[in-house]
Amino acid sequence: MTAILERRESTSLWGRFCNWITSTENRLYIGWFGVLMIPTLLTATSVFIIAFIAAPPVDIDGIREPVSGSLLYGNNILSGAIIPTSAAIGLHFYPIWEAASVDEWLYNGGPYELIVLHFLLSVACYMGREWELSFRLGMRPWIAVAYSAPVAAATAVFLIYPIGQGSFSDGMPLGISGIFNLMIVFQAEHNILMHPFHMLGVAGVFGGSLFSAMHGSLVTSSLIRETTENESANAGYRFGQEEETYNIVAAHGYFGRLIFQYASFNNSRSLHFFLAAWPVVGIWFTALGISTMAFNLNGFNFNQSVVDSQGRVINTWADIINRANLGMEVMHERNAHNFPLDLAAVEAPSTNG
């Protein structure tokens, strides 16, 4: 008789902690990226909620005219926002300990920089966490690649654009009205609607919505019935079953007859790759467009009106867009400068008399 004795390996506290962090058996996977994601996301969320409710007005333009953004200072859910850090701070790193007092930090919009930097770090870690979980489960990494599109867009708006413009005060205010404010100012200063990368982004977002709706409706309409006509089609399936639940050939045939034969996919993998790639590539281009316009590589402009042989202006749609842009720029930071930069940079025309 042979007895085999095995020595029980003692696992250190650090080893047990590492196993728990990287375990795929947890209800929610943590991962090493999650170790950084959780505190940064909680910090950004907590400060956002507190500042949205109670932050005092912020001197966004650096001209001693503070702007209110919180609920307790007269705003509602629609008009409220976290006001960006003051132009007086520019791009300086502005933690609480850099200010003479907490009141000064709040007056200069310190919470905005704190929220944005923690938020960007947390969403980047969330993307890394997606890759980490995919790796440990033996999956391919494309979920994290797809998520990189909104991460790139957020980074472009909250970090690259302020860097290009020279101040965090040019960042997007964190609120519903703040989003619209950035859109209007962006159009006025960069003519974003005439930028080809923005056009690709619009095609990606709206096209992705259209394709998702088409795909979902086709799948739902071509289920393989496992029940009688008197029972719900849903009763014939169980969650996670290996058998196909819908007939892609039927869906392909329907769509091919509805438009034309080659407008539909007969391969499920090709179809789902297309559904993922279309909006992701579009949003990548939008983020790239924001990043280039941050350094004033703007959309197409038609600042010179079309004139006839007599020198008379032929009014075009471009003239209307130009006037709208100038009007929006006049209203933006109206107390910080008297004229839009486009007008202030041009010499005054000479007049006879």
From Swiss-Prot:
EC id: 1.10.3.9
Reactions the enzyme catalyzes: 2 a plastoquinone + 4 hnu + 2 H2O = 2 a plastoquinol + O2
Record-annotated membrane-spanning stretches: 29-46, 118-133, 142-156, 197-218, 274-288
Stated family: Belongs to the reaction center PufL/M/PsbA/D family.
Lineage: Eukaryota, Viridiplantae, Streptophyta, Embryophyta, Tracheophyta
Pfam families: Photo_RC (PF00124)
Protein name: Photosystem II protein D1
Gene assigned in the entry: psbA
Subunit annotation: PSII is composed of 1 copy each of membrane proteins PsbA, PsbB, PsbC, PsbD, PsbE, PsbF, PsbH, PsbI, PsbJ, PsbK, PsbL, PsbM, PsbT, PsbX, PsbY, PsbZ, Psb30/Ycf12, at least 3 peripheral proteins of the oxygen-evolving complex and a large number of cofactors. It forms dimeric complexes.
Binding site for pheophytin a: 126
Keywords: Acetylation, Calcium, Chlorophyll, Chloroplast, Chromophore, Electron transport, Herbicide resistance, Iron, Magnesium, Manganese, Membrane, Metal-binding, Oxidoreductase, Phosphoprotein, Photosynthesis, Photosystem II, Plastid, Thylakoid, Transmembrane, Transmembrane helix, Transport
InterPro entries to which the protein is assigned, alphabetical: D1/D2 (IPR055266), Photo_II_D1/D2_sf (IPR036854), Photo_RC_L/M (IPR000484), Photo_RC_L/M_CS (IPR055265), PSII_D1 (IPR005867)
Residues carrying N-acetylthreonine: 2
Sections of the chain in a coiled coil: none
Post-translational events: Tyr-161 forms a radical intermediate that is referred to as redox-active TyrZ, YZ or Y-Z. C-terminally processed by CTPA; processing is essential to allow assembly of the oxygen-evolving complex and thus photosynthetic growth.
Disulfide bonds: none
Residues at which [CaMn4O5] cluster binds: 170, 189, 332-333, 342, 344
Alphabetized PANTHER family for the sequence: PHOTOSYSTEM II D2 PROTEIN (PTHR33149:SF12), PHOTOSYSTEM II PROTEIN D1 (PTHR33149)
Residues bearing the modification Phosphothreonine: 2
